[in-house]
Amino acid sequence: MPGLRDHSQRLITFARRMRTDPTDAEKKLWGLLRRGRLDGHRFRRQVPIAGFVVDFCCLSAGLGIEADGGQHGDERDKQYDQQRSEALLAKGIRIIRFSDYDILKYPDAVEEAIGRALAEQPPP
């Protein structure tokens, strides 16, 4: 998707910093996604898009994946996440979310869910 990535220096710097200090769940999820393990789909980590940084993104499939830690539990954060997901969907990126707990405890189920999301047709 040409022109989708956000090249503002602030976001690029933030994304680089996030790549150097991933959470345990992000490390585990990256192990599932890297090197085209899911039917050859290529994912990137900490991708600046539309004013946000998406934890993992497959641009060709229009799919973003978020690893949500405990900070995503309160109502205010849930509303922000919903608005963020809607803004990214408007740019052609569907967001799916997994809790850090699920990523660490049920990686096979997470991998299956990602595979199903990749198989779905992206919204128009």
Residue ranges and their predicted role:
Residues 1-42, 90, 119-124:
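Solvent-exposed, charged helical/coil patches
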Residues 12-23, 45-121:
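Basic, amphipathic alpha-helical patches used to engage nucleic acids or provide basic targeting signals
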